[in-house]
Amino acid sequence: MAQIDSRQYRSLMRRFIARRFVVHQRMRGFVCSALPARNVLPELQGLLLLLLSSTLFADEHVNYNRQIKPVLIERCVACHGVLKQEGGLRLDTAVLAIKGGESGAAIIPGDSGASLLLNRVTATDGSERMPPEGEPLKLDQIAALRNWITQKAEAPVDEQPQRHPRDHWAFRSPTRPVVPQIEIPSAEQARWQQNPIDGFIAAEHRTHGLVAQPETDKRVWMRRVSLDLTGLSPTPEELAAFLADESPEAHNRVVTRLLDSPQYGQRWGRHWMDIWRYSDWWGLGAEVRNSQKHIWHWRDWIVDSVNSDKGYDQMLREMLAADELYPNDLDRLRATGYLARQYFIFNRTTWLDETIEHSAKAMLGLTFNCAKCHDHKYDPFSQVEYYRLRAVFEPYQIRTEMVPGELDFERDGIPRVFDAHLDVPTHLHVRGDEQNPDKSCTMHPEVPAFLSSDELKFEIESVILPTEATNPGLREFVVTTHRQAAEQQIEAARSAVKTTGLLPAEQAQLALTVAEKALLTAEAHLASIDARAFADRARHLQSALSGVSTDNNLGSNAPTIQDLAIAAAKSERILTAARADEDRARAELALVQAAADKKAEAEQKLATANTALGTAKTAIDMSSEEYTPLPGAKKTQEDYQNRNASAPFPTTSTGRRSAFAKWLTDPRHPLPARVAVNHIWMRHMGRPLVPTVFDFGRNGTPPTHPELLDWLAVEFVEHNWSMKHLHRLIVTSQAYRQSSSNAGAPDANTSVDHDNKFYWRMNPIRMEAQIVRDNLLHLAGELDVTLGGPSIPVNDETSHRRSLYFVHSHNDHQKFLSMFDDANVLDCYRRGESIVPQQALALENSPFATEMAGKIAARIAAAAPSASDAEFLRTTFVTILSVEPTAEEQVTMSELLHRMTELARIKDRPNPEILARTNLVQTLLNHNDFITIR
């Protein structure tokens, strides 16, 4: 049979698939005639694949570890591995494949035609083909498999089968390993033995024959650590102070100052906003479809928590269940914005799926989403367990709490979660289809069995909520806010009474009547607020004191609880009548003022107002205890139909989420500390210890430094999950203080570890989008470092706030930030890094960058008005890049500055020296060392 190379194959298949008719192609006398593609038999397609795969790359030696095993692991072992053995067959080693299962040997070395495995992966019958789900194996994979079998199915003799999932490194609780003691040349020994981190890094250097780069210049370290911890480059004054400090504690003093700075929380708060998928609300018009209005309260909680060094475990507990753990603490309730952000109005299943998927990825470092349709292919997590985990979150909904001084929930409020439906069932969706739930069985809340043990338990206890959590109107500030608004309404009404004399006589009298009625309405409103507040408090007292009935006096002359409820209800009816009377007066005035052609309409409105007033007056004397409690919170609509909109807030909560939060943050849990440490390490060191940052499972990549990861995780937990402690450890390590340059490094370093996964040098890191913009403002002296507050519209080009405060949502992106790889709102566990021409153009030509360059130049000049060009050049380098210019740079840039000045004069431009200096600043802003953290 003639050989067909890969290029011919690809060309053939493109034509075969893309065209409506099958290409006339002759191979050894076999002709695929020009039949319509829709009529091509599956057998014909399969035969074509078989003919091609049998000849493709036939003479090439097949490498089992590189070409065969990855395919078996990816496509086969989910059903034929350690977790599951369909038909008694395992394919995780060549020996087990040759041994076979119930149908016999899957592979017969040397005889591909008789090998069951090859027959099944090339089968054209859908019921026979393997794998049964997803796309068939690719042609080159089939060819490699066929040729490997023909070549006697050679594999390493020491190949080991998959270990049981319980033995997977990430599923075992970390224990503190002994720090390696490494013999290092005396000149380096002192530096590499002061920090435990360095012992682990140095051990890998020795194992792989790597030589660490020397410690970087103090200026470079100062810029590196300042940008890492606060996102802002050091000022020339800060840099000079550090250079002058020759004490052993100089580095530590800098770290302490940076960690104590409020800008630390803004910098690292943005990192966690990436991981936890922060997104402002988006929708259509005023309709919220995803996330929540005022979700910025959660963002501010993140920044505040990071600045105060709140334990990471405590942060997780508050985000998942502050409403159950701290139901009366509005400050902590902000944290549940994490769950409120998952809101999706159109589909509750999508809402909960994203809650599960991203909680697992961010907090556990595991991927659970595929288990909604079938058992997990790699980790011991079944479809049933997926829906049991969903049951943990099933009852929660969202409401917005009133904040002091604001009655309008559209203007402000704290979005938080609560368990709205305590008995809502969870059913398994057959093959993940929400339209096909299995209602024969209710899923009870549970956590994955493979992460549970006698020590690590998931125990649910129902939570009895305090009355203020059930009736937010009882909060003192809520009553105060309502009263203040009513009192302002009264003052406004009194002022209106005094201004009616300016109208014509007839209208003036009617206007006075309207103003007086409005005053009565305002006074009735205040009276109603007081009456309802009294009744609310009485009912609260009744619920707090067992044995007190509704008609039991609380004092010898005190009104009964029933009396207060009746009074509150009557006050509401009086308020309704007062408003109706005011409306009637306004209708009378409108009739007098109406034009001739509008008289009939005005008369109709007056008649309607008279009817409403009569109804309201009649209702005043009705006997009823039903009144509207003072509103202290507003429920978010649950779905597009807004069902259950008026349901009262429950008096208890299921306790499911607080049980989950406690289980998750148990110090013995194997995953959360490791996952957090990996994220923090990556953002300092430029690459993670576990490359698959959201997948620590069996399909993820193992850690490059497993002992270091475990040591850091244990250290993290034993120091109260303190992020500041971890930061200090990392940034004061010798590994962190290395040069990022490979200049002078042995050739073996780059040949053995080209990607620097063993940290023989520091990794240079490109600034994130927010840090680029913030530093332009910072260098210009224009940055507003104010903490917190509502999100800034993306089109507000006048704002100089830090970039994390811009609106960030599916619909709205700040254009400058988007240019520099801003965070993806759908998920962003690790920022992308791109280098594209548009970035340089943005720094060179955008109005924002141009304006900041001018202000940077002006600021430097103002600090030293009589500075020479050489002095200006040196100060500019130190200000923007934190380094002194080299002799070569000094000469080159001085010449450039001179030429730009002369060119500006030739073109008769105003202020040529200033223009040239501004251009010099812009040049340095486009320097790679500005946008790179070295």
Where are these regions (language model features)?
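Solvent-exposed helix-loop boundary motif
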Residues: A58-T150, E154-A203, T207, R219-R224, ...
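Primarily short, surface-exposed interaction patches in extracytoplasmic proteins
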Residues: R191-R224, D228-Q263, Y278-L320, E324, ...
